[in-house]
């Protein structure tokens, strides 16, 4: 490699080492052994392109031409980034438990073991061991759902939007579906109930007003082309004040009298009474079925605490129509999702232990007093490491559920707050936290970076992570 710097652009270009000479350099041998020739060659090509740009703009060679160890360092950094995982663990201390951008519900240890097992070994996904013949992939879930909800059967797809699309496509394509104007929700990403209706080939019939819908509104809208009335749980917003809605039991009776279906989209969905965790009670699939709803859909990765999935429960004959619809194959879940979902549902067989088994329930169950004790220990240990640039204090704050669930319900929590002091910058601190081995994601306020302690998984691990970050400042 060059140690003298030529003085013309042409000479500088000629002075750049060739790809073959770089690959033959003993300094790069460990990288070639670890990453392979193709990856190292691509990284070298990037460095050579940058070097040519430097020559064109500044008429000089890069420093690594005179110091091979610098090139090795650049390559190590680049290859490490190329081979790093973008989907990696982070600390969700944002104050939103079910954070859509951070993957929503954390899985239970039982679900993690179940997924690992079916990844490692063949599994009877569509095979009945007892009969020795082909089975259905939803069978692993069906028995559990029947016990937990009282449904005759169930169907599992990859999210609740898919569940709603499949329901409408299978039972109402080419016909009318009646929905209250107050329930025409947008579920995120500009994805709205009318859009799903249109995609399913249904005609949306709006009834009532935004804040008030009565039984007579539904009665007057039913025609010979009506396939169903659809109830949509407004889980991601709340209308209060001068309001009126028709209960499912009354609509169920109307639908039976008029020979049409009653279907329900519960959105986030829940199988247990959440009031013991300080949350509002959510309508459950079992309650909807008891009220006469024919098909109910809900999410698996929100309040249920499982993997991303959409569940549809209801009458056997209707579920059979869903299972045989062409969309079902396109929307079906793989063995990893089904294994995690089965493990999650098993926890619900013993609802008294949910706060010990499901991470989301454990977070709901924590008291503010417990969180304050954790905060005091962290503050005492970390304050000396962040002084004098940052001060630490504990503040009372509120945690929200997230993912469109219970938008007007908050749990009392404790925040560990960092305040900028002598030369400190909250913007730089936030970036520093995001560059940790396990990035720490908090919430930036006007004058503080707040870590909501309700999101902690392991106090000792978080202390170690933050201590390292403090030392690195």
Curated annotation (Swiss-Prot):
Keywords: Cytoplasm, Protein biosynthesis, Pyridoxal phosphate, Selenium, Transferase. GO terms for biological process: conversion of seryl-tRNAsec to selenocys-tRNAsec; selenocysteine incorporation. The modification N6-(pyridoxal phosphate)lysine is found at residue 302. Its main location: cytoplasm. GO terms for molecular function: L-seryl-tRNA(Sec) selenium transferase activity. It is found in: Cytoplasm. GO terms for cellular component: cytoplasm. Pathway: Aminoacyl-tRNA biosynthesis; selenocysteinyl-tRNA(Sec) biosynthesis; selenocysteinyl-tRNA(Sec) from L-seryl-tRNA(Sec) (bacterial route): step 1/1. Transmembrane segments: none annotated. It catalyses: L-seryl-tRNA(Sec) + selenophosphate + H(+) = L-selenocysteinyl-tRNA(Sec) + phosphate. Its cofactor is pyridoxal 5'-phosphate. Belongs to the SelA family. HAMAP family: SelA (MF_00423). This is L-seryl-tRNA(Sec) selenium transferase.
């Amino acid at each position: 490699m060059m140690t003298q710097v030529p003085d013309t652009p042409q000479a500088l270009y000629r002075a750049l080492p060739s790809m073959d000479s770089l690959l033959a350099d003993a300094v790069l041998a460990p990288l070639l052994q670890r990453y392979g020739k193709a990856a190292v060659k691509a990284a070298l090509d990037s460095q050579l392109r940058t070097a040519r740009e430097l020559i064109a703009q500044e008429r000089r060679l890069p420093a690594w031409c005179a110091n091979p160890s610098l090139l090795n360092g650049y390559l190590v950094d680049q290859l490490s980034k190329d081979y790093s995982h973008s989907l990696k663990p982070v600390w969700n201390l944002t104050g939103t438990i079910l954070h859509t951008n951070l993957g929503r519900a954390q899985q239970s240890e039982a679900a993690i073991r179940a997924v690992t097992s079916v990844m490692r070994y063949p599994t009877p996904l569509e095979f009945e061991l007892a009969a020795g013949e082909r089975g259905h992939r939803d069978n692993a879930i069906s028995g559990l759902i029947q016990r937990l909800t009282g449904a005759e059967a169930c169907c599992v797809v990859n999210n609740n939007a898919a569940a709603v699309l499949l329901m409408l496509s299978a039972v109402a394509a080419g016909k009318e579906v009646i929905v209250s104007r107050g329930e025409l929700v947008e579920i995120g990403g500009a994805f709205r109930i009318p859009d799903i209706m249109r995609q399913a080939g249904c005609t949306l019939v709006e009834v009532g007003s935004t804040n008030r819908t009565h039984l007579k509104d539904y009665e007057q809208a039913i025609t010979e082309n009506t396939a169903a009335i659809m109830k949509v749980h407004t889980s991601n917003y709340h209308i209060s004040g001068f309001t009126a809605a028709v209960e499912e039991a009354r609509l169920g009776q109307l639908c039976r009298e008029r020979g049409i279906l009653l279907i329900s989209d519960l959105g986030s969905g829940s199988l247990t009474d959440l009031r013991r965790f300080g949350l509002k009670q959510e309508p459950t699939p079992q309650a909807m079925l008891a009220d006469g709803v024919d098909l109910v859909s809900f999410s698996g990765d929100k309040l249920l605490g499982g993997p991303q999935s959409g569940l549809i429960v209801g009458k056997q004959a209707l579920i059979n129509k869903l299972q045989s619809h062409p969309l079902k194959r396109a929307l079906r879940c793989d063995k990893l999702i089904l294994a995690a979902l089965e493990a999650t549902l098993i926890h619900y067989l013993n609802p008294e232990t949910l706060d010990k088994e499901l991470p989301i329930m454990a977070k709901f169950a924590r008291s503010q007093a417990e969180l304050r004790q954790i905060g005091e220990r962290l503050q005492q240990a970390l304050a000396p490491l962040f002084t004098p640039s940052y001060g630490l204090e504990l503040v009372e704050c509120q945690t929200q559920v997230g993912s469109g669930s219970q938008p007007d319900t908050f749990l009392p929590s404790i925040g560990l707050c960092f305040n900028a002091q002598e030369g400190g910058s909250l913007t730089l601190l936030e970036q520093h936290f995001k560059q940790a081995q396990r990035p720490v994601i908090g919430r930036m306020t006007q004058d503080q970076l707040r870590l909501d302690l309700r999101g902690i998984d392991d106090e000792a691990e978080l202390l170690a992570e933050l201590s390292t970050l403090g030392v690195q400042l």
